[in-house]
């Protein structure tokens, strides 16, 4: 998933921070909220910062996928409440179309996504009020009404519905940007690239996809990981030159 464009962006961020701090980087203990800066004596210290930053980008990818899952779970709870009310009042049962959406059932049951959730910074199940605000936007949207009004239900329609929800409701949402920024200052910088990966992931699901359907890996192959390591190490070796450029620019 992490391509060379994202690697270059993250490398610039890490090296810029390195230069501003006069060659100091965060230690692992400080990243956890304790400890102090350590003077850089080995390029691998900066390399660790880069790999950690890339890891948070992959965390964002999984976080955005699980946001859709949590919206669907809230839809199920709403359906169950409506069903109980309908039974009490002797009314027809509400439509199951949304909660039986075949693509979403695949995504929710995906084993890789379930495993990745263990390491996520945001547990959407603890953010029900926020998730409900997104759910309400979905319920009030034209795309939801159009989806529910169709007479024929196909897998392609189910998948396309969630692709549209992501593209038109989740991507263009300032409240999501604010929420993500509270958890990681750099996540909004990553959103554009990560959003394209989420849409690509949705499109890769097929009607016969099982719970073993692969999501995008953090790195496509070992070559991409080695590229990241080599790029940041070479950048560290030229850090004095880059600091001089920053100093010259700030004087102007």
Which sequence ranges carry the predicted segments?
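Class I Rossmann-like S-adenosyl-L-methionine
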Residues: 1-252
